Amino acid sequence: MSIIDNRKAYHDYFIEEKYEAGLVLEGWEVKAIRAGRANIKEAYIIVRGEEIFILGMHITPLASASTHIRTDPTRTRKLLLHGAEIARLIGKVERAGFTLVPLDLHYAKGRVKAEIGLAKGKKQYDKREDEKKRDWEREKQRLMRVKA
């Protein structure tokens, strides 16, 4: 079950591969995500050394968040993956012109996980072509309903 989706990522990128990654979160962040107060539309993923981080993910703290903890809604959060997966992703990002984008946040066995995608950017004509295909599929469905 998805908590938050990044539909903009599917519009702007061709998603080649998907990976599930854990997130290093603080307690107040988990509570806020469970309440649906997170946004990953502007988020992006970077590689620093042998580690992968997500930047720009905004988690709005709940009003009941502790007063003696400084809450930073857009702090850099580390992604948890196996070493072999990290090595494979780093290789593709550095060599093949791919980028990493967050696709969604979801639960897996009670934990908050992020689905990240290995993606290539779409050109403007690719986006227009996808929109034409989507419109044609809608029109076909509409015509089928009218005939039936």
Curated annotation (Swiss-Prot):
Top-level taxon in the UniProt lineage: Bacteria
Record's GO cellular component terms: cytosol
CDD domains registered for this protein in UniProt: SmpB (cd09294)
Pfam families: SmpB
GO biological process: trans-translation
SUPFAM superfamilies found in the cross-reference section: Small protein B (SmpB)
Keywords assigned: Cytoplasm, RNA-binding
GO MF annotations, alphabetized: RNA binding
Coiled coil: none
InterPro entries per record: SmpB, SsrA-bd_prot, SsrA-bd_prot_CS
Subcellular location: Cytoplasm
HAMAP family: SmpB
Record family assignment: Belongs to the SmpB family.
NCBIfam families assigned: PRK05422.1, smpB
Identification of the protein by name: SsrA-binding protein
Species of provenance: Azoarcus sp. (strain BH72)
Origin organism lineage: Bacteria, Pseudomonadati, Pseudomonadota, Betaproteobacteria, Rhodocyclales
